[in-house]
């Protein structure tokens, strides 16, 4: 297997292999389509329609109608395609340092966004056509050093790798950046928008704290503790009603957090009449990343101390232009120009409501030799969690919505077939909104 993903409403599961791709219904589990395209390394569906996006070679994407067996269009890019995201309005293609945004109705190119290097394709496009938001790591502008480069040297990227976990919220309908959310002190490892495009879940490379923000205003609503020790987050997934958030990592435990309790977030700074057109930034830093100041408990968090406000904060109209370069420069100008008041939060992040322990042996006879990669989703019709693992297992667990606790394995299938291999190339296990 090369790739596996759920569609936007989790009703289908797509698997890419060296021999082609397969599409399954998740409830009840059954194979509904097989494609014979060779070496499919990315496949993404548009809900339960016959439209799929397929990557077979590094720089090439094919949009295909599986029902008619026809190719709708083919796209070639200047560098390797790392991920594809789509909804009923927009089609996004992620390269390492660019995002190409298309109108899915006619596949016309609408916008090109320059980004910091994003080798893990951290990006989420909401499934909603109304709240059509694209979230990705905030580009970090390269600082001018004054050093002269040789004339024959290739031009440097205007951005460098992020050193903190800030998320840029981009309106894919109006083609404007609308907010920056300071989610974590450490760089991001995974983000996910909910089905309605109103919530954003984030995790940093530390992997111990999961946060949920409102979109597009960026207010922090929930903070959850996944664990005490650092972990690599593989998948974040809201259920369809946005009352639960499921998290998988490089441990054998999958955590389910409940949303809908007391809303906890940062109070908003007082706004002047002109502040409505400025970037609003929600600051929420990982307490486990670095030593907390005196008087702050290990489980608490503290926002940065406010700095002197820059004179050149600007407005959305003056900062945001059609050019993606101007988006980056505008963001950079406002980052240093608008800081909220200092706030110290003394509340402990909430623990999981329920959890799942994956089988130690997986789908094989012998126990796994290392951590299993997984992608998770939640059923839209029952309190069940669906998990696909890197050894080809498809597991369905029942969750007690009253008491929580450990989920019960109720069904188990395999998405492997006799000619599939679990050997390299490495498998990309991503949820649709990651």
Curated annotation (Swiss-Prot):
Annotated InterPro entries: PROPPIN, WD40/YVTN_repeat-like_dom_sf, WD40_repeat_dom_sf, WD40_rpt
Motif range (L/FRRG motif): 224-228
Extent of the WD repeats: 1-34, 183-223, 228-267, 367-407
Residue pairs linked by disulfide bridges in the UniProt entry: none
Segments of skewed composition (Basic and acidic residues): 274-286
Gene3D superfamilies: YVTN repeat-like/Quinoprotein amine dehydrogenase
Pfam families: PROPPIN
Compartments, record wording: Preautophagosomal structure membrane; Vacuole membrane; Endosome membrane
Cellular compartments per GO CC: endosome membrane; phagophore assembly site membrane; vacuolar membrane
Keyword Protein transport: yes
Main location: membrane
Coiled coil residues, start to end: none
Family named by the database record: Belongs to the WD repeat PROPPIN family.
Protein purpose: The PI(3,5)P2 regulatory complex regulates both the synthesis and turnover of phosphatidylinositol 3,5-bisphosphate (PtdIns(3,5)P2). Necessary for proper vacuole morphology. Plays an important role in osmotically-induced vacuole fragmentation. Required for cytoplasm to vacuole transport (Cvt) vesicle formation, pexophagy and starvation-induced autophagy. Involved in correct atg9 trafficking to the pre-autophagosomal structure. Might also be involved in premeiotic DNA replication.
PANTHER family: WD-REPEAT PROTEIN INTERACTING WITH PHOSPHOINOSIDES WIPI -RELATED
Quaternary structure and partners: Component of the PI(3,5)P2 regulatory complex.
Domain notes: The N-terminus might form a beta-propeller domain involved in specific binding to phosphatidylinositol 3,5-bisphosphate (PIP2), leading to the association of the protein to the membrane.
Designated name of the protein: Autophagy-related protein 18
Protein source organism: Botryotinia fuckeliana (strain B05.10) (Noble rot fungus)
Name of the encoding gene: atg18
């Amino acid at each position: 297997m090369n790739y596996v993903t759920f569609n936007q409403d989790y009703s289908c599961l797509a698997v890419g292999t060296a021999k082609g791709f397969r599409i399954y219904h998740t409830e009840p589990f059954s194979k509904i389509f097989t494609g014979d395209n060779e070496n499919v390394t990315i496949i993404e569906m548009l809900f339960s329609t016959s439209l799929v996006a397929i990557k077979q070679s590094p720089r090439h994407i094919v949009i295909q109608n599986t029902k008619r067996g026809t190719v709708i269009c083919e796209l070639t890019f200047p560098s390797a395609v790392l991920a594809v995201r789509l909804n009923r309005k927009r089609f996004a293609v992620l390269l390492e340092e660019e995002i190409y945004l298309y109108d899915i109705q006619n596949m016309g190119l609408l916008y090109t966004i320059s980004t910091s290097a994003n080798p893990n394709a951290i990006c989420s496009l909401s499934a909603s056509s109304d709240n059509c938001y694209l979230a990705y790591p905030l580009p970090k502008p390269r600082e001018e050093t004054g050093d002269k480069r040789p004339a024959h040297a290739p031009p440097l990227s205007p951005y460098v790798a992020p050193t903190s976990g800030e998320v840029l919220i981009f309106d894919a309908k109006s083609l404007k950046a609308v907010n920056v959310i300071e989610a974590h002190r450490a760089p991001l490892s995974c983000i996910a928008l909910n089905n309605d495009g109103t919530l954003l879940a984030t995790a940093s490379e530390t992997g111990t704290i999961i946060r949920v923000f409102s979109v597009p205003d960026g207010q922090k609503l929930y903070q959850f503790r996944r664990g005490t020790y650092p972990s690599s987050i593989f998948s974040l997934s809201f259920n369809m009603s946005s009352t639960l958030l499921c998290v998988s990592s490089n441990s054998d435990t999958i955590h389910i957090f409940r949303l809908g309790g007391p809303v906890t977030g940062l109070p908003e700074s007082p706004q002047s009449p002109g502040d409505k057109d400025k970037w609003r930034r929600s600051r929420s830093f990982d307490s486990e990343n670095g030593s907390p100041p005196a008087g702050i408990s290990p489980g608490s968090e503290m926002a940065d101390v406010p700095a002197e406000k820059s004179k050149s904060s600007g407005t959305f109209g003056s900062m945001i232009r059609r050019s993606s370069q101007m988006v980056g420069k505008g963001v950079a100008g406002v980052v240093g120009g608008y800081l909220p008041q200092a706030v110290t939060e003394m509340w402990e992040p909430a623990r999981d409501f329920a959890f799942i322990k994956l089988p130690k042996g997986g789908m094989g006879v012998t126990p796994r030799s290392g951590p299993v990669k997984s992608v998770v989703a939640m059923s839209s019709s029952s309190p069940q969690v669906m998990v696909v693992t890197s050894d080809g297992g498809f597991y369905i667990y029942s969750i007690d919505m009253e008491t929580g606790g450990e989920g019960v394995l109720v069904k188990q299938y395999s998405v492997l077939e006799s000619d599939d291999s679990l050997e390299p190339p490495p498998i990309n296990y991503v949820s649709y909104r990651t």
